[in-house]
């Protein structure tokens, strides 16, 4: 499986991989498929992602009034976080590190949503903005499991 380091090494000359931390890669709930292996083509910098990141599509009629497409984290993130006190912090560290490490990404191909050309913004900025969008979810999770 691609989430295994040995398999990733087979493609290491061409691709970089990242697996989210703090969430269950395979959830016991079949509706929750928030984790995925993110792959970045080394030469082009293009990121391919299944479920972890989504692209919010703006209908053409609304593009004059709403911000351009942007990255968001999967809406079921809260259900995918591991049931322990440090899961939210581990997810934040992973996402922040990914944003910094892959900041020069020009395009994100997000399965089930859209292809996002990062123009006028950058990957780091959008991932950090997406992280801000799930801040309450992460804080609720942290508080819920802090006492356990």
Residue ranges and their predicted role:
Residues 1-146:
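Metallo-beta-lactamase
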């Amino acid at each position: 499986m691609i989430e295994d380091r040995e398999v990733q090494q087979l493609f290491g000359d061409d691709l970089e991989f990242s697996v989210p931390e703090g969430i269950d890669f395979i959830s016991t709930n079949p509706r929750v498929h928030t984790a995925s292996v993110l792959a970045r083509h080394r030469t082009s910098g293009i990121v391919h992602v299944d479920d972890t990141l989504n692209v919010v599509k703006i209908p053409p009629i609304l593009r004059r009034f709403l911000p351009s497409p942007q990255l968001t984290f999967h809406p079921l993130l809260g259900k995918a976080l591991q049931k322990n006190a440090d899961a939210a912090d581990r997810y934040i560290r992973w996402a922040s590190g990914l944003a910094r490490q892959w900041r020069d990404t020009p395009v994100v191909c997000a399965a089930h949503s859209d292809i996002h050309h990062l123009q006028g913004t950058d990957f780091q900025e959008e991932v950090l903005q997406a992280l801000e969008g799930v801040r309450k979810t992460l804080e609720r999770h942290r508080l819920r499991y802090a006492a356990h």
